[in-house]
Structure formats: structure tokens, C-alpha cells
Amino acid sequence: MRQLKGKPKKETSKDKKERKQAMQEARQQITTVVLPTLAVVVLLIVVFVYVATRPTITE
């Protein structure tokens, strides 16, 4: 049967399995890449704010 333009094709079980695999890999990347990077950025901000606002001792 000819596929008409603009209508999405019906998702096969193979397509569904590939999509689920891609989503699983994306979730795994979130925990292995995004969270440690975010933790480093937050740590840098905290250190910067601490250094910028610490009291200085003048003699």
C-alpha cells in the first residue's frame, strides 16, 4: 500500500523496541553524564560564593 505524504507510518514492534532501547540509553546517560556535570557546576558556584563573601582579616 502506498504511503501518503503527511501521514505517519504505523509503528512496528521493531520500531517500538528500538525506541525503547534509545530511551533506556538516554536515561543511562542522564545518570552517568548529566548529574556529575551538574554536581561539579553547583560545587564551583558554592566555592566561588564562599570565596567572594568570606570575611577578610585586616591588620
UniProtKB/Swiss-Prot annotation:
Residues 9-31 form a coiled coil. GO terms for cellular component: membrane. Pfam families: DUF4519. It is found in: Membrane. The chain crosses the membrane at residues 32-52. The keyword Membrane applies. It is a single-pass membrane protein. Keywords: Coiled coil, Membrane, Transmembrane, Transmembrane helix. Residues 1-23 are annotated as: Disordered. Residues 9-22 have a biased composition (Basic and acidic residues). Belongs to the SMCO4 family. This is Single-pass membrane and coiled-coil domain-containing protein 4. The gene is SMCO4.
